[in-house]
Amino acid sequence: MSEAAQTLDGWYCLHDFRSIDWSAWKTLTSDEREAAIREFLSLVEKWQETEDKQEGSHAIYTIVGQKADIMFMILRPTIEELNEIETALNKTKLAEFLVPAYSYVSVVELSNYLASGDEDPYQIPEVRRRLYPILPKTKHVCFYPMDKRRQGNDNWYMLSMEERRNLMRAHGLTGRKYAGKVTQIITGSVGLDDFEWGVTLFSDDALQFKKLVYEMRFDEVSARYGEFGSFFVGNRLTVEKVPVFLHV
């Protein structure tokens, strides 16, 4: 039997995608819409207070295309906190006009196809920064879920640890070419959601998503073993832009 890779696990993660019922939103009076926006921004302010204390993080992006209109990405120490945040959002007036489109539950993950050592990895500052990240404030985001193939001779889980380590090392070298252009956060979701991993890419240049994903398709680990779900691409929505975005 092949050896399972050990993982380092950090904050729990929720990607919450919503579509907006614009027709229903327009039926409110201007005062009602403004009150709903203020209530929502008050909730986001609480999220920001948590982030300022480095006890979690969040990002809000508008989504391009018809899969969704808005994405909330939330990081918290426990899965209960994610549930509480989702419930608090659902209790707002604005949520009456937010239609669930897609969601993804996972946990920030570093796999150790890493070198082993005597030091506790959870005490290494760089490892902690990656397991408990403050989300980048880039202009654009790209999220997609993925699996490793388990078909015929292309069964990732039948490969030896050394084979998997070598394939992932080559894959990582491709990713390093985009250092400074794209920031990647990998979240593990085996047993938590329908795919095995979620990949969230952040960049100030959306074209870099295409370039990175395309180049990685030629890595053997992706060409032979990668299977992908839907891609969601969006633009950052700051608190200052929320009233403009929701103006009708």
From Swiss-Prot:
GO biological process, one term: heme B biosynthetic process
EC number: 1.3.98.5
Positions contributing to Fe-coproporphyrin III binding: 130, 144-148, 171, 184, 222
Gene Ontology molecular function: any one: heme binding
Metal-binding as UniProt keyword: yes
Active site: 144
Catalytic activity as recorded in UniProt: Fe-coproporphyrin III + 2 H2O2 + 2 H(+) = heme b + 2 CO2 + 4 H2O; Fe-coproporphyrin III + H2O2 + H(+) = harderoheme III + CO2 + 2 H2O; harderoheme III + H2O2 + H(+) = heme b + CO2 + 2 H2O
PANTHER family for the chain: COPROHEME DECARBOXYLASE, HEME-DEPENDENT PEROXIDASE YWFI-RELATED
Family that this chain belongs to: Belongs to the ChdC family. Type 1 subfamily.
Described purpose of this protein according to its UniProt entry: Involved in coproporphyrin-dependent heme b biosynthesis. Catalyzes the decarboxylation of Fe-coproporphyrin III (coproheme) to heme b (protoheme IX), the last step of the pathway. The reaction occurs in a stepwise manner with a three-propionate intermediate.
Record-given protein name: Coproheme decarboxylase
Lineage: Bacteria, Bacillati, Bacillota, Bacilli, Bacillales
